[in-house]
Amino acid sequence: MIDKSSADILEISAKCGYLTGLLKNVYRSANIIVTDMSPLLLDSFDHNHKLLIDDENLEFQKDSFDLIIYSLGLHWINDVQRFLYNIRTFLKSDGIFIGNFVGGDSLKNLRKSLIDNEIASGFKHSPHISPFIHFDHVPMLLLHAGFSEVIVDYENIALKFENPIVLMKEIKNIGESNALNSQHNYAISKKMFSLLKNYINVFEDNITLISFIAAPNKNSLRLKLL
């Protein structure tokens, strides 16, 4: 088990600090460092050890942490293999890395809807939705990064919205709007907006939430989860 009295914990991309609060309740005497790339989010909650830093530019000493947690962020990482390798080096030999992210065939209906409506509006298609890591690729990515034990699971979550525009607004409101948007040379036209908005039926889609636990050494997970 992780020693609750002296654990060194890193939470990457803490956002509004909800998970930070849960960690502080469980590991009351632990050294918990949290990071985020948004100063507004870091200022939104109280914690002694906060770092303003991009998720892909983390710099810590080797063997620094007993536990590293990364919730709903891996789908934003450009060089996933390099990121996972760095996480592995930050962990102590008996440490644990826990994370989840949006992956698989998430938002495939929205992706298709955008392509169809761009064609109907006379636009050349540009990517509106970032590519996702598939469930089957996760174990190999972690193993190649130096982890020896990996447990991966997933959950499909159904979405129902009035139309694609409402779904896109909700995605934007939770801070998950596409990083590729800045590369577009145009905004959604009035014609395309109308096509997306005037769906006859409820617009349905899904997201796949992929979760994993990984450890550098074999048997670490079994011993810690007993």
Curated annotation (Swiss-Prot):
<keyword id="KW-0808">Transferase</keyword>
<dbReference type="InterPro" id="IPR029063">
    <property type="entry name" value="SAM-dependent_MTases_sf"/>
</dbReference>
<protein>
    <recommendedName>
        <fullName>Putative methyltransferase RP459</fullName>
        <ecNumber>2.1.1.-</ecNumber>
    </recommendedName>
</protein>
<dbReference type="GO" id="GO:0032259">
    <property type="term" value="P:methylation"/>
</dbReference>
<comment type="similarity">
    <text>Belongs to the methyltransferase superfamily.</text>
</comment>
<dbReference type="Pfam" id="PF08241">
    <property type="entry name" value="Methyltransf_11"/>
</dbReference>
<keyword id="KW-0489">Methyltransferase</keyword>
<dbReference type="InterPro" id="IPR050602">
    <property type="entry name" value="Malonyl-ACP_OMT"/>
</dbReference>
<dbReference type="InterPro" id="IPR013216">
    <property type="entry name" value="Methyltransf_11"/>
</dbReference>
<dbReference type="GO" id="GO:0008757">
    <property type="term" value="F:S-adenosylmethionine-dependent methyltransferase activity"/>
</dbReference>
